[in-house]
């Protein structure tokens, strides 16, 4: 049986020597947000804790300034209750 080989995750920001994550870099921030608008955890992306905190703060600031949406789905959901005749 062959073993599954998983690539080692690494922090992209440490490798590139980034000092501070900029909230205005929307293209980069979109890579760390799911389709539903949630912030992707560091165990998935491989980002170290220092930059994960900066990343979360930058995403929250960008959302507050309307540079990023809070959610991609702006569909109004039907209520769970049914009407009684």
Curated annotation (Swiss-Prot):
Q: Name one GO cellular component term.
A: cytosolic small ribosomal subunit
What terms describe the molecular function in GO for this protein? small ribosomal subunit rRNA binding; structural constituent of ribosome
Sorted keywords for this record are:
Ribonucleoprotein, Ribosomal protein, RNA-binding, rRNA-binding
Tell me the GO BP annotations in alphabetical order: translation
Q: Which residues form a coiled coil?
A: none
Indicate yes or no for the key word RNA-binding.
yes
Name the InterPro entries on file.
Ribosomal_bS18 (IPR001648), Ribosomal_bS18_CS (IPR018275), Ribosomal_bS18_sf (IPR036870)
- Specify the superkingdom: Bacteria
PANTHER family hit by this protein:
30S RIBOSOMAL PROTEIN S18 (PTHR13479), SMALL RIBOSOMAL SUBUNIT PROTEIN BS18M (PTHR13479:SF40)
**Stored NCBIfam families:** S18
Q: How does it assemble?
A: Part of the 30S ribosomal subunit. Forms a tight heterodimer with protein bS6.
The name under which this protein is listed is: Small ribosomal subunit protein bS18
- Species of provenance: Hamiltonella defensa subsp. Acyrthosiphon pisum (strain 5AT)
**Gene from which this protein is expressed:** rpsR
